[in-house]
UniProtKB/Swiss-Prot annotation:
Region G1: start-end pairs: 15-22
UniProt binding sites for GTP: 15-22, 62-66, 124-127
This protein's encoding gene: era
Lineage: Bacteria, Pseudomonadati, Pseudomonadota, Gammaproteobacteria, Pasteurellales
Chain's role: An essential GTPase that binds both GDP and GTP, with rapid nucleotide exchange. Plays a role in 16S rRNA processing and 30S ribosomal subunit biogenesis and possibly also in cell cycle regulation and energy metabolism.
Membrane-protein topology: Peripheral membrane protein
Chain residue ranges for the region called G2: 41-45
Description of how the protein assembles with itself and partners: Monomer.
Pfam families to which the protein is assigned, alphabetical: KH_2, MMR_HSR1
Transmembrane portions of the chain: none
Protein name: GTPase Era
Region described as G3: 62-65
One GO term (biological process): ribosomal small subunit assembly
Chain intervals for the UniProt region annotation (G4): 124-127
InterPro entries, alphabetized: G_ERA_dom, GTP-bd, GTPase_Era-like, KH_dom-like_a/b, KH_dom_type_2, KH_sf_prok-type, P-loop_NTPase, Small_GTP-bd
Length: 300
């Protein structure tokens, strides 16, 4: 019996902060592996998502949002991570918000001019455009900025046109063996996913009160004798006032964050979880490259 030819390739998902890159990746994979928030720059690491369908395997890299502001060490590192993801891929999906184009979009576009891989422009959030007649002038304008492989309007939130985007992706995959088993959806560890889930809940339940000077370190992740994951998470903030925001009145906010995070972990890991959270002040961690290295923001 002749073996079927298989196809595999790497695809970078890039764009400015808060255009729906992580939502798009989660929709393609059919489950959440990249955290989402209304706040900009939710994604801090390169998240790898793997989508295998028959003979095709697409390995997606969801990057931190590229932006102009680089005052803090963590912002510089996120920009560096996003830029390096563009270098060695088979296809780049450039996600933009169809409701408006800004200077950050222009900055990303300028980086893409130097990319070797073809670029697909995914115009997201078209469901938010009430007058669809406004979309055509937007497409006409951006189509003149770069020679795109394809331009496709999508709604990552609703799943509109995602199937057609995946068809475009398949045309860029190369003949070759699959890099991951077909049941893999990410190369990230459960420990890493636990920290990301906690961070997502922090951003959701602190609203605009808490800036991005917060991170999560998993101090313990083990399966106990009863088959329950015991997870201890340390939440690091930069100031005492931020610690109080996270804990909330009588510890209620921290309790809510913990409950919601535990429920998400149990769904993702398909296992019971016992989660404990602590909050600690670590001044200046987001500007300290040694601290960022120890927290996993810099690859050794």
């Amino acid at each position: 019996m002749t073996e079927q030819e298989t196809y595999c390739g790497f695809i970078a998902i890039v764009g400015r902060p808060n255009v729906g890159k992580s939502t798009l990746l989660n929709k393609i994979l059919g489950q959440k592996i990249s955290i989402t928030s209304r706040k900009a720059q939710t994604t801090r690491h390169r998240i790898v998502g793997i989508h295998t369908e028959g003979v095709y395997q697409a390995v997606y890299v969801d990057t931190p949002g590229l932006h102009i502001e680089e005052k803090r060490a963590i912002n510089r590192l996120m920009n560096r991570a996003a830029s390096s993801a563009i270098g060695d891929v088979d296809l780049i999906i450039f996600v933009v918000d169809g409701t408006h184009w800004n200077d950050d979009d222009e900055m990303v576009l300028n980086k893409l001019r130097r990319a070797k891989a073809p670029v697909v422009l995914a115009i997201n959030k078209v469901d938010n455009i009430k007058n669809k007649d406004e979309l055509l002038p937007f497409i006409t304008d951006v189509s003149q900025k770069l020679e795109f492989k394809e331009i496709i309007p999508i709604s990552a939130q609703r799943g509109n046109n995602i199937h057609n985007l995946e068809k475009i992706v398949r045309t860029s995959l190369r003949k070759g063996v699959h890099h991951f088993p077909e049941d893999y959806v990410t190369d990230r560890s459960q420990r890493f996913m636990a920290s990301e889930i906690i961070r997502e809940k922090l951003m959701r339940f602190t609203g605009e009160e808490l800036p991005y000077s917060v991170t999560v370190e998993i101090e313990q992740f083990k399966l106990n004798d009863r088959g329950i994951y015991e997870i201890n998470g340390l939440i690091l903030v930069e100031r005492e006032g931020q610690k109080k925001m996270v804990i909330g009145a009588k510890g209620q906010k921290l309790k809510t964050i913990g409950t919601e995070a535990r429920q998400d972990m149990e769904r993702l890991f398909d296992n019971k979880v016992h989660l404990e959270l602590w909050v600690k002040v670590k001044s200046g961690w987001a500007d300290d490259e040694r601290a960022l290295r120890s927290l996993g923001y810099i690859d050794e």
